[in-house]
Swiss-Prot record:
Cellular component annotations (GO), alphabetically ordered: intracellular membrane-bounded organelle; membrane
Region: Disordered, residue numbers: 1-31, 55-83
TM helices/strands, residue ranges: 98-118, 140-160
Protein name as it appears in the record: Transmembrane protein 91
Residues in compartment: Extracellular: 1-97, 161-172
Species of provenance: Homo sapiens
Name of the gene this protein is made from: TMEM91
InterPro entries: CD225/Dispanin_fam
Membrane topology summary: Multi-pass membrane protein
Cytoplasmic face residues: 119-139
One BP term from GO: hematopoietic progenitor cell differentiation
Entry similarity comment: Belongs to the CD225/Dispanin family.
Length: 172
């Protein structure tokens, strides 16, 4: 099995460079003469790669950007979104666990509304409506906390009523 030598493999890469390597002129070494790797890198400098840049969280943080034109047709108008061009790459919390807990264990009518808004958060994020997702997330959290508060009040009222009933009964 014949394997090509290293020089034969490098030859197509070094054809366009005008660099003389130290192996070609062993006695002569000029200050600043580039090595083969540097010459290859310099030959690629003029080429432009057509692939788009990969998205990154930190890409372009210091570079000014024109403001993004967002769809302002969201039905959630009470959002406190500031309209900045740098959007958070993180999904707003949907508070689904709180909504399920408040629906099953606390005050179910408000818990159902919190559950619906928690689902709306994920749908708005999937559509790219970050403003609507944030507003739905805040509403789901507030309704979940309200349902837990109303549930605690309901349970406390039930315990007080039960204690009053048992205290008013005559012992057997």
């Amino acid at each position: 099995m014949d394997s090509p030598s290293l020089r034969e493999l490098q030859q197509p890469l070094l054809e366009g460079t005008e660099c003389e390597t130290p192996a070609q002129k062993p006695g002569r070494h000029e200050l600043g003469s580039p090595l083969r790797e540097i010459a290859f890198a310099e030959s690629l400098r003029g080429l432009q790669f057509l692939s788009p840049p990969l998205p990154s969280v930190s890409a372009g943080l210091g570079e000014p950007r024109p403001p993004d034109v967002e769809d302002m047709s969201s039905s959630d108008s009470d959002s406190d979104w500031d309209g900045g061009s740098r959007l958070s790459p993180f999904l707003p919390h949907d508070h689904l666990g709180l909504a399920v807990f408040s629906m099953l264990c606390c005050f179910w009518p408000v818990g159902i509304a919190a559950f619906c808004l928690a689902q709306k958060t994920n749908k708005a994020w999937a559509k790219g409506d970050i403003q609507g997702a944030g507003a739905a997330s805040r509403r789901a959290f507030l309704l979940g906390v309200l349902a837990v508060g109303l549930g605690v009040c309901t349970y406390a009222a039930a315990l007080v009523t039960l204690a009053a009933y048992l205290a008013s009964r005559d012992p057997p």
